[in-house]
A protein has these predicted regions:
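Conserved mixed alpha/beta core segments that line enzyme active sites in large multi-domain catalysts
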Residues: 1-269
Length: 269
C-alpha cells in the first residue's frame, strides 16, 4: 500500500495534468554508464479520467507494478548477465505526461523515437559520431519492443536506406503501431505493462487523420511511392514530408538533442 500522505499530492498532480500519464522507473542501474538497462523494467500508461479516485486506483496499481518489475524473472536474469545484484539497485518512480493526440477512444503521438549519439553501423556518407535515430508512428513501446522502425541519420535525413527502393520500402517499413486504449480503466490490471495498449494496423491511423505529415502513398498503377497522402493505395510510413521537405525541423532537433545530452553527461547517450 502506498503512504496515505501521497494521496493529496496525487490529486494536486491530477488537477494540473489533463493528458494520459506514463508511470516509469528511474533507477541507479538505468543511469549506469557501462551497460544498457533501459527497457528492462515496466512502464505503464493510464488514461486521464474525470473520476480522480479511479485515477488514483490505477496510478497506485501502476506504481506497485513498476517496483515489482525489479523482481521479474527477465529482470533478474538481465541483472545476472550484467554482473549486478538486486541489493545494489535503488529506484524512484516518475510520473510523466504522455505526448500525443486523442482520436476517439485511443491516444497516441504521430511521432516517437529513440536517438543514439553513436552510430555503430554507419553506411555510405554517414559517420559514427553523427548518431542514429529510430522513428515510428504511435507509442514508443513499438520501438523498444523491436518493431520495424525507420532508421535515420539526422545529418543525412534525405538518405534513408529503407525507402531508397520501392520494394524495400513496402517490405521494411512500419505496418502496425501502439495506441493507449482510453476505455480501459485498469479493471484487468496485469503484470504485462501493455495490457491496456492497442496494437493496430497503420490503416487505422489513416482513418484518424494522423498520417498527413509522416506517410507516403504507394501507387500500384504507376508502381511508385509518392510523398504525401492520396486516395487509394497503401500508406507507407516514410516521414518524407518532415525529413526531406522540412515541414517540421525534426532533423535539426535530432542533431542537437544527442549533442547536448552527450555534452552534459560527458559520455555517449
Amino acid at each position: 500500500k502506498l503512504p496515505d500522505r501521497l494521496v493529496e499530492d496525487f490529486f494536486a498532480f491530477f488537477d494540473v495534468v489533463k493528458t494520459p500519464i506514463a508511470i516509469r522507473s528511474s533507477s541507479l542501474l538505468e543511469d549506469s554508464h557501462y551497460q544498457p538497462f533501459a527497457g528492462i523494467y515496466s512502464t505503464y500508461m493510464i488514461p486521464y479520467l474525470d473520476d480522480k479516485y479511479e485515477m488514483l486506483r490505477m496510478l497506485s496499481d501502476a506504481i506497485k507494478g513498476v517496483y515489482a518489475s525489479v523482481y521479474y524473472k527477465d529482470s533478474k536474469a538481465y541483472m545476472q548477465a550484467t554482473s549486478n545484484v538486486i541489493d545494489q539497485e535503488k529506484m524512484a518512480v516518475i510520473l510523466q505526461e504522455v505526448v500525443g493526440t486523442q482520436y476517439g477512444d485511443r491516444f497516441y503521438p504521430s511521432i516517437s523515437g529513440v536517438a543514439r549519439s553513436i552510430n555503430y553501423y554507419p553506411i555510405n556518407d554517414e559517420l559514427a559520431e553523427e548518431g542514429t535515430v529510430s522513428l515510428a508512428l504511435g507509442l514508443g513501446k513499438y520501438i523498444v519492443d523491436g518493431g520495424l522502425t525507420l532508421r535515420v541519420c539526422p545529418y543525412h535525413p534525405d538518405k534513408v536506406l529503407q525507402t531508397s527502393e520501392m520494394e524495400m520500402a513496402l517490405r521494411e517499413t512500419q505496418t502496425r503501431f501502439y495506441a493507449l486504449d482510453l476505455k480501459n480503466t485498469g479493471q484487468n490490471f496485469s503484470l504485462d505493462d501493455g495490457f491496456n495498449l492497442l496494437k493496430l494496423p497503420v490503416k487505422e491511423a489513416e482513418a484518424d487523420g494522423s498520417l498527413n505529415y509522416i506517410a507516403s502513398t504507394y501507387d500500384p498503377y504507376d508502381m511508385v511511392i509518392r510523398d504525401g497522402i492520396y486516395p487509394g493505395g497503401r500508406k507507407v510510413i516514410t516521414f518524407a514530408n518532415i525529413l526531406q521537405h522540412d515541414v517540421f525541423p525534426l532533423a535539426e532537433i535530432l542533431r542537437l538533442a544527442p549533442k547536448y545530452g552527450q555534452g552534459e553527461v560527458r559520455r555517449p547517450v
